[in-house]
Amino acid sequence: MEILLFNTRDELLRVSLKHVVYFESDGNYTHIHFSNGAKATLLYSLSNMEHLIDEKLRGKVQPFIRIGKKYIVN
């Protein structure tokens, strides 16, 4: 199971990539939409998020694909 860790202002957020449906860009923020309907917002650009995903999944099959400037979908 691949997990990304993010320090937010209030907590350490663990994001399991298998539960992510898509990432959505909103300027310098990225909204993460999960399969259970939950949503998290992080102060990361979509380009930074794409780089983190690529680094985490290096050498593995990558189920995520970038769609234009606004989305990365699973």
What are the residue ranges of the model-derived segments?
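Basic, polyanion-interacting recognition surfaces, primarily
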Residues: 1-74
